[in-house]
Amino acid sequence: MDRIRIRGGRPLEGVIDISGAKNSALKVMVAGLLTDERLELENVPALADVATMAQLLAQHGIAVEETGAKQLSVGGAITNTEAPYDIVRKMRASILVLGPLLARTGEARVSLPGGCAIGTRPVDLHLKGLEAMGAEIALDGGYINARAPKGLHGATITFPFVSVGATEQLLLTATLAEGETVLVNAAREPEIGDLADCLNKMGADISGIGSDRLTIRGVKALHGARHTILPDRIEAGTYACAAAITGGGVLLRGARMFDLGALASTLGEAGVDVTEVAEGVTVSRRNGLHGTDAMTEPFPGFVTDMQAQFMTLMAVAEGASMITETIFENRFMHVPELNRMGARINVHGSSAIVRGVPGLSGAPVMATDLRASFSLVLAGLAAKGETIVNRVYHLDRGYEAVERKLAACGADIERLRD
């Protein structure tokens, strides 16, 4: 099992190219189920989760082929409507094949999903929304069995709380449902806008993109299209924290300030200079960090996928800060590992109190999930001495070429292969 070794204390200086967004690429790949024609995708990151999605789509008869650097061609006729446990368990986004399979074939059998071990993250809203559109659903032996013997129809669906996954599920499905579907209190994340843009290129009729009210008018069929995946705002935010925690300065080439949402202003409050420029976003920190509170919220609020990284930054800030997690439970699993490196963090329910320390010390640590894994890398970059991050397969699910990108900016980092 691979590990990453870091010798900390070096400011990051240089340019980091931001990859395509994992959380968009996976969903846009699923859109390939909605047509027999080919979907040509550009700026696709080379990640373990992308490979897993390609494996899942192949299970359904959809071929995913590399056509060039960061380019994929997705397409084919559906030959199988079952998504098996051994693939679905690896990645939560796998659940999104349910609606498209149902819309195209009238039936689907999909295992309940896996992914990071972050709380329960139920799929109730997915299933209730599909039922409102005419689906018949039963749970049996860890599988979702869905049928639509009379086809799917439009519906007005109001989410009781914002759900990115449920919004994506019903957005994909409604493109081929008869009539009009309205999603009220829909998630507004940039990746959802990117998915909607791709679907419209394929012939869908979606309006309200970027708002919390999406209107989808079903069409008879979708066709192939070419689409470029938007830059990964989580990767950009993560490297912004890397520049800040090392006291360096980097250009995040391709990053978009708007997509960072509340993270940009929160970093500013903490003493980090975040500036939009023609090529992307620059991030620098020449003076001290200040303890700053953060509460995770749906976009454009502070994104939950940056909570662990920002907490690491606050671990070396002057003063105290409180980080509150409102999206997922059980998302503080990185705290004991950070404390092993000298951080002073106490968890109280859904909040963590972070009391800044002058510095961290290198130590062997264990990654527990995707974003937590990079929080430990950040700690290693700032720490005195050597840090070994174990279980970096979590990291490979969502970050492309981590060692290369960091080393190019001056980090002393290498991958150890067992």
From Swiss-Prot:
Keyword Zinc in annotation: no
Catalytic activity: phosphoenolpyruvate + UDP-N-acetyl-alpha-D-glucosamine = UDP-N-acetyl-3-O-(1-carboxyvinyl)-alpha-D-glucosamine + phosphate
Leader sequence segment: none
GO process terms (BP): cell division; cell wall organization; peptidoglycan biosynthetic process; regulation of cell shape; UDP-N-acetylgalactosamine biosynthetic process
EC number from the UniProt entry: 2.5.1.7
Pathway as given in its UniProt record: Cell wall biogenesis; peptidoglycan biosynthesis
InterPro entries (UniProt xref): Enolpyruvate_Tfrase_dom, Enolpyruvate_Tfrase_sf, MurA_subfamily, RNA3'P_cycl/enolpyr_Trfase_a/b, UDP_GlcNAc_COvinyl_MurA
Record PTM 2-(S-cysteinyl)pyruvic acid O-phosphothioketal, positions in chain: 116
Main location: cytoplasm
Similarity field: Belongs to the EPSP synthase family. MurA subfamily.
Function: Cell wall formation. Adds enolpyruvyl to UDP-N-acetylglucosamine.
PANTHER family, A to Z: UDP-N-ACETYLGLUCOSAMINE 1-CARBOXYVINYLTRANSFERASE
Protein name: UDP-N-acetylglucosamine 1-carboxyvinyltransferase
